[in-house]
Amino acid sequence: QRQMCIRDSTQGWLHCDIPGTDASGVVKSMMDELIDEFRNCDMPNRVHITTSCCQINCGGQGDIAINVQHTKPPKINHDLVANVCERPSVVARCPVAAIRPAMVNGKASLEVDEKKCICCGACFPPCPPMQINDPEHTKLAIWVGGNHSNARSKPTFQKLVASGIPNNPPRWPEATAIVKRILKEYKEGARDWERINDWIDRIGWPRFFEVTGLPFTKYHIDNWRGARSSLNASTHIRF
């Protein structure tokens, strides 16, 4: 049966202590907008949509994924760092070595090298005084083409297709509109039993951005040179 599945990977504002958005709310909003697709089950193949309210803990591969995107480095409350945070652990947590110990106003604290910071939010859970959530600068991003399955093609990682989307509760209309647009083109253009990643592989990324009307920018290009030699994106046996 060609059905749709939407799930949130976390409890968002209801339960989690570090959310940048409310994943449960995003799911409810999109389910309301896509209710006919759930009733009719007439997509070319199963569509797995996921939402996450931070970039580091919850989440997973999905045909379409709506994730938080922080756009500013954390703001540090230096008065609280020494009493709340285990500074060596916070320094070690940063994936790009952008955090280092510092003395501020005679108190042990931390500082962030904003040129290195990638705004991932990994420092916030172990050190709440490093506040990164912001009503203006915390956005949403949409990724597509993630697939765990090894049935028709090799497993694939998600690719960014839209970023800087307003984090606009309670209905998130901007994010919902983009997801509906992607699903519309997939429904009309994909062949029977093609997953979204298979459809994109067949038509190509330039054609995908053309039919969906999404702007393509330099930030969509994955230029990390180490990806090919260090990331095993397939479960196929290689010699």
Describe each model-derived feature in a short phrase.
Residues 2-6:
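Short, small-residue-biased leader/transition segments that mark boundaries at the very start
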Residues 7-20, 162:
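Short, hydrophobic beta-strand segments
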Residues 10, 48-55, 196-209:
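A glycine-rich phosphate-binding loop feature that marks nucleotide/adenosyl-phosphate handling sites
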Residues 15-24, 58-63, 119-121, 200-219:
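Short glycine/threonine-rich loop-to-helix capping motif typified by GTGT followed
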Residues 34, 39, 43-46, 64-125, ...:
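Ferredoxin-like iron-sulfur electron-transfer modules
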Residues 59-66, 153-156:
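Short acidic, glycine/serine/threonine-rich loops at helix termini
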Residues 147-190:
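A hydrophobic, small-residue-rich beta->alpha segment in the mid-to-C-terminal subdomain
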Residues 209-211, 215-239:
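Long C-terminal interaction/binding lobes of large macromolecular proteins
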